[in-house]
């Protein structure tokens, strides 16, 4: 989560409203923050009263940064907050959580760009479909699945269609809160 060490380069102000949306649903919730970077979603959820935060990122530096940011926001002082972290490939980590039978009230999936070139768009859409499938297996019934795409080459309607197609294949009815 720094220009020198990661794909993502810091705090993304364009996600400010989305972090607030997640926080609005986080009181007493269990929250999975996938591709967590500096933990913007995790920190907001913790500050709003989440009971469990589980972060996943490929970068050990990012996971350390989440801990630093939680401490800076005094979230770690809450005795009722459990913080778990996984350093590793997000797809593999999510699959392991599925195998372990884990479920969360809120699942946040905010990956780096999957389509640096136009030729990568089909692969990126398949990755979003796979993330949706995993997210649906990890979110509790009635929970919040939050997905984002920062791939400028992915048309918003194609992204939404991909998410909804996977939900249909899984037999899950989605209710969009916000686009």
Q: What is the predicted function of each stretch?
A:
Residues 61-105:
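S-adenosyl-L-methionine
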Residues 104-134:
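Mobile active-site "lid"/loop adjacent to the S-adenosyl-L-methionine
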Residues 1-29:
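SAM-dependent Rossmann-like transferase core, predominantly class I methyltransferases
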Residues 52-57:
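Conserved SAM-binding motif I beta-strand of class I
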Residues 28-37:
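Conserved class I S-adenosyl-L-methionine
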Residues 38-51:
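Conserved SAM-binding loop of SAM-dependent methyltransferases across substrates and taxa
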Residues 139-141:
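Helix-to-beta-strand junctions that scaffold the AdoMet/dcAdoMet cofactor pocket
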């Amino acid at each position: 989560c720094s220009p020198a060490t990661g794909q993502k380069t810091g705090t993304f102000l364009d996600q400010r409203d989305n972090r607030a949306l997640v926080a609005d649903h986080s009181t007493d919730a269990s929250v999975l923050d996938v591709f967590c970077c500096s933990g913007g979603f995790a920190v907001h959820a913790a500050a709003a009263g989440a009971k469990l935060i589980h972060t996943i990122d490929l970068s050990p530096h990012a996971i350390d940064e989440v801990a630093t940011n939680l401490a800076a926001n005094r979230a770690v002082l809450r005795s009722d907050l459990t913080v778990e972290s996984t350093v590793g490939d997000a797809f593999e980590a999510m699959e392991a959580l599925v195998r372990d039978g884990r479920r969360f009230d809120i699942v946040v999936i905010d990956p780096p760009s999957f389509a640096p070139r136009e030729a990568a768009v089909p692969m990126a859409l398949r990755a979003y479909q796979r993330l949706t499938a995993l997210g649906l297996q990890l979110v509790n019934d009635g929970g919040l699945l939050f997905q984002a795409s920062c791939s400028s080459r992915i048309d918003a309607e194609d992204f939404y269609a991909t998410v909804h197609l996977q939900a249909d294949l899984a037999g899950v009815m989605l209710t969009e809160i916000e686009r």
